[in-house]
Amino acid sequence: MTTPTPSGATPTPSRRRLLRFGAAVLPALALGAALPTAARAATAAGAATAAPTLRMPAETDRHDRTFMAWPALSSIWGNQLTAVRDDIARVAAAISCYEPVVVVARPGQAADARYWLGPGGGYGITVLEIANDDLWIRDFGPTFLTAPGAIAGLDTNFNGWGKSGTPYYQPYAEDAAVTDALLYEYGVDRVRAPFTGEGGALETDGQGTLLATASSLVNPNRNPGMSRDQVEQALKSSLGLSKVIWLPGLAGQDITDDHIDCLARFTAPGKVILDQPGPGTDRIWVDVYRQTRRILANAVDALGRPLTVTELPGPDRQSIRGKGKDFLSSYTNYYTANGAVFVPQFGDTAADGTAYAILQAAFPDRDVVQLDIDAIAGGGGGIHCATQSQPTVPPLP
């Protein structure tokens, strides 16, 4: 099995990877419009045969494990550091009842993290000593690409959401190095993306369609000098896509510039969950919702199918436990694992119940597990932001 690599940078396959997939030749590949292209594996006779294109799979595909990250810095979380660690431990414990969980933690904090997290559920929790700054591994961790018999990790060049010099800035140097260290640990080839972004900005149906907000990707704080068409081509070539459905989003009002994973999500090909702001939500977010609803109502996916959109009402901002401008009261930031969907509950009993019912209808073969994550949400993120899945390698035909 081979994976595409940036021009002039042919990685050395680790022993782990060779044991897992067998010896292979790793050719260099120019980025341009061809990343990733068909992987090539040498046959016993030495002839080369083309393998399917690597692409970003749907999150609903089967996982090998879930990655998370241990909150590291009081300079980021202040007096909420203990509370947010409790939330991370709660989420990790719940997910570990359905699939293995690996939590990266600074070497000096790993022992405390192991004690705090405990053994987890039936699939277990493992603490891996990799330096990090914060918990948002969806954004700074690898975005995985798969094909039959092949897997690679896309490094999306995390730059702290482009917030240097703004009130939203926080340290990110360690986070920016996590993808490389994590992929090395698991023997997965790393591919550098021809754009800058985050995993939370990318939502795919696994069949060639991507949902994305222009505010978070066509933005000079990530991709200066790139037009929307240029960003779209970079996304298509690096994620194995054929269609990008652009939503305007809203820049400058949160640290992510309105990531898609808090706004609209695929529950299946052709089916989208749309976040509907609850009572008390700022008018600017209601306008984003209306614009998004209008675009999705007229959109088709990569296979020409119109989208079926189900609205997921948010809670009443006056009825929830969490407060503050940055508190993310979005049920749409759920996470799908093997056999389960993990979604916040905010204390608005009626809205929490409605979210449960809508997600159970959308995922009838999965358990819907609701969790208290108020400390995480107070930092502007949710369960999806705090997790990243490693998909199972599809079998060869």
Regions found by a protein language model. Give the residues of each.
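N-terminal secretory signal peptides
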Residues: 1-14, 24-31, 37-38
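Basic, Lys/Arg-rich alpha-helical nucleic-acid-recognition elements, primarily the DNA-binding modules
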Residues: 20
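Sec-dependent signal peptide cleavage junction
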Residues: 36-47
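The feature marks the mature, well-folded catalytic cores of soluble enzymes
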Residues: 46-397
